[in-house]
């Protein structure tokens, strides 16, 4: 068949473009089409590493899963990762440079060439490409340097669907205003509008839809109801890391760092009955959890200093002395050591900082970035978390720091190459690792949570059965696709795509 494409652009950030792309990808896949997602430029600290060691935005990984494809860095050729005064630019899956944000325009033409090459390669491998824009497509102050919205639609020669979010209010003004701000040639690309996150009686809303269509002379293809799906996407960051007051039988506190990255590490914990995940950034919020997790961060030293300044650092040390188990992941792992050195200014202007001193490791930042998928085994139980020794785990590493392991550190995780990628202290109260995604290993997470409950005298009435991660995700993608089919004019959408 001839190559087909369609692009979802938004009236603003967080209107649900990623979710709608995911929905359409799964629908088209279920129709037997060879479909793939594409986003020219992503801005996120929530990244992923492909099998060939290339880094890309997490949202396109989700969309690839909906297409039943392995994630491919071609799907997201440019990823911007803000870090303090600088932004790290990932191009074609590898670090391209660290740049001050105001200088980004200087890279525009270079990145545009890379984006076009990536799209051309991807489109040769698939029959249909579903593209996603970034933020608002009508930011007139950024138009000259924009490579991810209408400029990308032109490169792909893709028809555009404009998405707006009614839940935040002002949906009609945002749709009309967005279209009016575009030049005529770009307006002509918009073939339909989708109103997202609707709550209420659709029959009462229909007259307003007709009025809108008369004003813009573009059909509204449907109204998507507000519905929650357990799908990782950039728009869910705020929802996931908000502070929850309710406490289940097992209370896990995750430190909400200013530059926190890879929040998807903890998605599976949110799905386990009687487990409450609380994100905290003040000593008073920490209380007495059953487990403290310090997550990954794009600026380890700065976030460590922030914890010292607001006394959260002291509170964590106090809880450790009373026996509260602590787990650090990536940047959190580095913080648990004795010293962090950044003489090259990889993350910022602070050259060194003392860590918690819980683990006998010293970390030095290098310009070379480690990006790889990793499989390994748990080498020992922890004091509060037993029955995990011997568990097989898999995940991925994204870090500039290299940690030198001292004699007092106890090896906790060894990868299949024989390298130690995590250690614990001699009391086995504190542990850390470079592995993101380790909780997605079903055998490990089941034993981990069950043992943690038992250690805290929480009744475990039956084995903790966690639905296989891939099956769970698959069901959510199908549920999303079904809602999309029920509320969007699929016939008209296919006609726009010439399918």
Curated annotation (Swiss-Prot):
Keywords: Cobalamin biosynthesis, Glutamine amidotransferase. Residues 249-444 form the GATase cobBQ-type domain. Belongs to the CobB/CobQ family. CobQ subfamily. One of its GO terms (biological process) is cobalamin biosynthetic process. The keyword Repeat does not apply. GO terms for molecular function: ABC-type vitamin B12 transporter activity; catalytic activity. It comes from the Bacteria. The active site is at 330 (nucleophile), 436. Catalyzes amidations at positions B, D, E, and G on adenosylcobyrinic A,C-diamide. NH(2) groups are provided by glutamine, and one molecule of ATP is hydrogenolyzed for each amidation. This is Cobyric acid synthase. InterPro entries: Class_I_gatase-like, CobQ/CobB/MinD/ParA_Nub-bd_dom, CobQ_GATase1, CobQ_N, CobQ_synth, GATase_3, P-loop_NTPase. Pathway: Cofactor biosynthesis; adenosylcobalamin biosynthesis. It holds the Pfam family GATase_3. PROSITE patterns: GATASE_COBBQ (PS51274).
